[in-house]
Curated annotation (Swiss-Prot):
GO terms for biological process: protoporphyrinogen IX biosynthetic process. The lineage of its organism: Bacteria, Pseudomonadati, Thermodesulfobacteriota, Desulfobacteria, Desulfobacterales. Belongs to the class-III pyridoxal-phosphate-dependent aminotransferase family. HemL subfamily. Its EC number is 5.4.3.8. It comes from Desulforapulum autotrophicum (strain ATCC 43914 / DSM 3382 / VKM B-1955 / HRM2). Its cofactor is pyridoxal 5'-phosphate. It is found in: Cytoplasm. Keywords: Cytoplasm, Isomerase, Porphyrin biosynthesis, Pyridoxal phosphate. Its main location: cytoplasm. InterPro entries: 4pyrrol_synth_GluAld_NH2Trfase, Aminotrans_3, Aminotrans_3_PPA_site, PyrdxlP-dep_Trfase, PyrdxlP-dep_Trfase_major, PyrdxlP-dep_Trfase_small. PROSITE patterns: AA_TRANSFER_CLASS_3. The keyword RNA-binding does not apply. The gene is hemL. This is Glutamate-1-semialdehyde 2,1-aminomutase. Pathway: Porphyrin-containing compound metabolism; protoporphyrin-IX biosynthesis; 5-aminolevulinate from L-glutamyl-tRNA(Glu): step 2/2.
Amino acid sequence: METTRSEALFKEAAKFIPGGVNSPVRACGSVGGSPLFIQKAEGSKIIDADGNVYIDYVGSWGPMILGHRHPDVVKALIEALASGTSFGAPTALETRLSQLVVEAVPSVEKVRMVNSGTEATMSAVRLARGYTGRDIIIKFDGGYHGHADTLLVAAGSGVATLNIPGSPGIPESVSAHTLSITYNDGEAVKRVMAEKGDRVAAIIVEPVAGNMGMVPPVKGFHETLRTLCTKHGALLIFDEVMTGFRVAKGSGQGLFGITPDLTCFGKIIGGGLPVGAYGGRREIMDQIAPAGPVYQAGTLSGNPLAMAAGIATLEALKKTGFYESLDAKTERLVTGLRTAAEKAGIDFTASHVGSMAGMFFTRATVTNFDEAKTSDLVNFSKFYTGMRDRGIYLAPSQFEALFVSAAHTNDEIDATIAAAADVMAGLV
């Protein structure tokens, strides 16, 4: 496809924006070439600056579960915009969105709105430390919980793509309070908790890892975390920024039957606008200012446009059979990709949890970050480029998930599988 306009825009952007992008993975550094500059989106499709149309499996990195420009969301935004863009004061929209979250996720009794997933996880960690009076946070290798200093340790997402273990600018005194353990290794967590459990404020984990590629939990892993946190008086934080309202109506915790103490949200609850939230048990959440001593604030928190888009989105998700339909579409995609790879004779594995999918160019079952890194990155890069050339838009990193939306049709999924078969046939 002709992408000269996107290439020119990228060069122009690099004059004014570090690396030409406002989030590192968008630069396409790990797959070569330059990023597409997007002009418009509709349903399951995006259109770049050169007018090329693509079936989109990035979905703005997860929020667009209904597809782009869903009419209910557009209507809600227009109505909210007519009243203003930001007030710096409470609105009824904040209460309604919070109510929808609380109704859908039983572990959440109160919720605080913020502006991003990073703000949500950062605030939840501060709250956990304030509530427990402890300092240590446990996370998992390849688990990306935003770019807050405390959590940018052995992270996935763009950090994995860049091969940076953390980031310059984070003092050792900060990272010293964060312990990172192999994901899905319950025995390793038991050993660490046996030694340091009385100093651990919280364990933070994604119900389904999404930034080392999509990696599901092994059986019993989350149950082990819940048991250990209860035993040692630590809080279990589920980072559901990606999985929240994506893998099931009740989010990851509802799907797996686990009750965390705190939960972080983002992406879908804002309907495509900047938003984040964290919530949990009443007695914990009431430690947040002004109800309690743990401080957190934000000029644009509870922004009325984001709240309106989020309300419209969560209301649409209540439709009977919504998640069953999404799951079936995603299963169709994943099965088709596996079949295409098998026919091509290449090393490949793919899986999904709800409408969140992942693939690796390896025959091994991937259960942690070290195993994810054994994927053939050269083949992934060739696959990404080949698919883009055929009108299929995937995340430009091996260490990201694919997202299917309600707007994707079976015909589009079949076209995606056919394109994949064509590309895979040419891979070594």
